């Protein structure tokens, strides 16, 4: 059965004009249509925040739940109904502050969820407080002299929790966003997609280096499994391994050719180089990595729970509560 973008649309979004949530919502609708996701077999779960209004604009099942608990509720949905496709949507505040513990455990357990993290480095709904991803020194209503905290780096948190899938896109890059959403859907297990977006009211310009197509040509690298790590406006630069780190080289200089450039391996179990890629671009002179950075197969929590239940049931004399009630004499009271 074929679906159209219109099949997933619902309601009128109430985000500020220019908010990155608009761009992401359009990409999610498009990705679902291209995948052929059945709306009646899909649930979108969110917490609290601007981005967490997203389930209201999806013609699927969904819940706009409580602050920070989207991953926990999405886990319950998936374990109770393994055939359901579950998308969990959180902002950086909702997902990594009050929801940080649920984020790491959903990754550790490897629950088959598509986990979307909309990262604008600010609390928008509560009017401009710094978030767990705001950079050190960031001036906000809750840090008028600049925050003295180091931020979470979502990829680092995901990898540290033994996450098996991590991808990144920019909200304004619709093709790039659609591709990682499709990859997340096809991955079996917890799939974290970080979406870089601006908050036009309280943190406009936070991702300006990669927000425009021209900016991405200069300041980003699109990574693809089994492809060389090449970037630049004219694809003139590449990445090579140097010791335990990476270095930027110019193709054609000092005898360097494309054959010398490091090839991306998203399926490598060891995440050392994947993490190096994911952490680039924070004022270090390296480009921001976009695309699927890590995609490794592993047993999923929901499959293991279902298999365990079936295994135990097969060993028991009674397989459900109704059978247990009918084990002895039964009387019907009228």
Residue ranges of model-derived segments:
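Flexible, low-complexity linker and terminal segments
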Residues: 1, 10-11, 201-334
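Conserved thiamine diphosphate
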Residues: 3, 131-184
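Short coil/turn connectors at secondary-structure junctions
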Residues: 11, 38-42, 80-86, 108-114, ...
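Short beta-strand segments
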Residues: 45-47, 89-90, 114-119, 194-196, ...
